[in-house]
Amino acid sequence: MKIAFLGPAPPFRGGISNFAMHLADEFSKQKHQIMLFNFRNQYPGLLFPSGNQYDSSSTDLPSVRMLTPYLPHSWSKTLKAIQDWQPDLLIASWWLPFFALSYGYILKRVTCKVVILAHNIIPHEEWLGTRTLLSYAFKSAHKIVVLSRSCLLDLKRTLPNNISRRGVLGFHPIYKPLQLQRYEAQAFPGLLFFGLIKDYKGLDVLLKAMPIIRLAIPDIRLRIVGSVYGSSRIYENMIQELELKANVECHFRYVPDVEVANFFAISDVCILPYKTATQSGVIATALSYETPIIASDVGGLGEYIDHEHTGLLVPPDNPPALAAAVIRFYNEKMMEPMREAIASQKDSNTWAELARLIIE
C-alpha cells in the first residue's frame, strides 16, 4: 500500500512530528511505501514564542517540505504533489484548528482514503470558531483516530453525528527508548517535569506544592526540563518567591532525543500536574524509560496510568493533593514496584497495533 502523511515531520521538533515519524517507520517496516508531505513552515513566529521550531532530528523516509498552512498558494501545490504520488491512504496529523483551512482544502480534493490522526479535538487554548473549523477539516475524513476516550467524547460533543461516528479510539504507543543507564545511588530524591511548558501544564501548581514536599523531604530536587511557550520569568519569579532555588534545577530549553535519557535516568518519578489534557506524549516517554508518573486526573491521562501500580493520579490544580502524592510515593517506597509494573506492561499498545487499527 502507498501511504502518505500530511503534517510535521523531522526536522520539525515536538511530539506531533515525533509521533508521525514513529508511525511512518512502523508502516515502512511492514513494507508499505511511504511519503511524508511535510511542512515547509509550520507557524508564523507570532504563534511560536518559544524559539526555534526545528531540531537536529532526521528521517530516512522520503519526505518533501511543501505545505505552509497560513499561505494558501502552498495548498494547491501540496495537493498536486499528493495526487501525483497517487497514495492509497493519506494520514493527516491534527492538533489545532489553525490547520483547518489548509487541511480542509486538501482533504476534500484528494482521491484516496483519508484518516485524520487527532491528538486533540478541543484545543487547550481558546480558538474562535473551533466547531466550524473542525467540521470543515474533518468532513472529508473516512476515519478519525483519537488517542483517548476523552478525545472521542469531545469529538461526539463537538461535531455532528455524520462526522463524529467516524471516530475510532486509538492510543499513544510507548516509544522505544534510547539505552538507559539508571543511577541507583542518588544523592537526593529526584522529580522531573518534562516537555514544552504552557500554562495548562500546571508547572505553577507543582512549584506551589514544592514547599509542602520539602517539609517532609528536605533534600527533594525538582528538575524542570523544556522550552517555555512565552517567557520563563513567571516561573523564575515563583522559584525565588517560594525560596526554592536550592531544590529546583531549571533547564528552560528544548531537549533533543539524545539527551532525554539522561534526565529520566536520574529521576525517580515524572510529574504531570496538568490543569487540562487529552493525552500526553510525555506519559509515553516516561513509560518507555520505566519511570513512574504522578499526574492530574484530567482528560485522558488516567487512561494511560494504572493508579497505584504504574503511577498516582491526583485532582487537578491542587498543590496540597499533589504534594501528598509525592510524599506518599517516597514514604511507601513505590518507585521499584512501579518500575516493575511498567516493565511488565510495555509490550502492550505497540506501534504495530496502532498501524493495524488505522488501515483496517
Please report, for each region that a protein language model flagged, where it lies by residue.
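Conserved acidic donor-binding segment of nucleotide-sugar-dependent glycosyltransferases
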Residues: 307-308, 312-319, 328-333
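A conserved mid-protein helix/loop that constitutes part of the nucleotide-sugar donor-binding site
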Residues: 17-22, 198-212, 284, 320
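Conserved donor-binding/catalytic core segment of Leloir-type glycosyltransferases
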Residues: 184-201, 207-210, 223-225
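N-terminal strand-loop element at the rim of the active site
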Residues: 7-13, 24-84, 151, 166, ...
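Donor nucleotide-sugar binding/catalytic pocket of nucleotide-sugar-dependent glycosyltransferases
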Residues: 139-179
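Acidic donor-binding loop of glycosyltransferase active sites
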Residues: 262-278, 291
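A short, well-ordered alpha-helix in the C-terminal region of glycosyltransferases
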Residues: 219, 334-348
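Nucleotide-activated donor-binding/catalytic signature segment of Leloir-type glycosyltransferases, i.e.
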Residues: 235-258
